[in-house]
Amino acid sequence: ALDFVADLTGEPCFWTAGKSPARPYYTGTTGKIMPYFLCVGQESHVNDYVEGANAALIAADVVRLLEGDKAFICGKGSDTLPPPTCLSCQTRVATYSVSLPAKAVCYFNVLSDHATPGDILNDLKDIANEVLLDSCKQMHKTALELALKGADVPITEKKGRVLTYKDLVETAEQKLGGRKEFARQQKAFLQTLDSKTDMREA
């Protein structure tokens, strides 16, 4: 085991520019996390809108709730950190299609000066659960509005669940018969990707 005497960071900061040319050292640093949301809906032709679930709607609701969320803003005065912001949001469709997209992804820049990754994950799970509830309510409302106009559509309440990456891996391991088989298939998949692939885009 290692015994740490001190933790130092020499990363340059904007506010040291123009000052005396001495090498600065800092007693702390900003924590950065890039949470990634994979939103899975249900594909259906646009004519059968109510029978599907548009993953783009779910992703849009994630952005609506997390973008600039004041609950994540840390610091005070000149040390106030920027709020969460979405760096990418897109549907996952291979080609042009007139079906509701079944998958959409978005990821964010989240900064903190005190929260642990576990703390942030718990807060993000709360947001994801709120998103799921809002999206399902919106889809149900749309179905009711179509029915009121005389459309022959099924009126069913959408349901879903929020899974962390850990939850997803554990589920996959159970379905595949264990951790070793999951690791083997995961490795095989990763080897099919171009070596220059940005893993956030895989």
Predicted regions and their residues:
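Acidic/histidine-rich catalytic neighborhood of metal-dependent amide-processing enzymes
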Residues: A1-G28
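Metal-dependent amide/peptide-bond hydrolase catalytic core
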Residues: A17-K19, Y25-T27, I33-M34, G41-A202
